[in-house]
Amino acid sequence: MIEGFAPKVDGFDHFEYGNHTSLKKSITNRTAAIMVETIMGEGGIKVIPEWCLRGIRKICNQKKILLILDEVQCGIGRSGKFFAYEYSGVKPDIVPIAKGIGGGFPLGAVLMNKKTASKMTPGTHGSTFGGNPLAMSVGNAVM
C-alpha cells in the first residue's frame, strides 16, 4: 500500500497486515509504538481480525510498546460501534480520529489513555488551528 507514497517517513517500519510473525520481526529495541488501522479502506475493505488485534496488544504489553489504533476513517460509529477496535475488547494507548468527528468538516483529534496522556505536559504539543470555535461546534454537534 505504500506504492506512490514515497519517500517513506524515516523511522517507520511496515509489517504484513494481520501477521504476528512479520510484526515481531519489525520490532527492535528502538520501537516506541505499533500503529495499526483497525479497518483499512484503501484497495478494498480489510478488517483486522479480532484475534490479531488482541495478539498485537499482548505483544505491546510484553515489549512495553504503545499501541496506536488508527480510527481516522472508521471511527465515530462508521463500523457499527463507536470505535472499530471495540469489537476486539482491546484497549489502545492512543487513538487518532478525524473524518467521522467532523461530519464532513475538517476536524481531527487524538485520544489517549490516562497513563499516556500524563506524559503530555503543557507546552509539549500545540496546534495552529487547535480549538477553532467553528470546528469545535461542529464536533460537538456530531458527538
Language-model region placement:
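Conserved N-terminal phosphate-binding loop of PLP-dependent enzymes in the Aspartate aminotransferase
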Residues: M1-M143
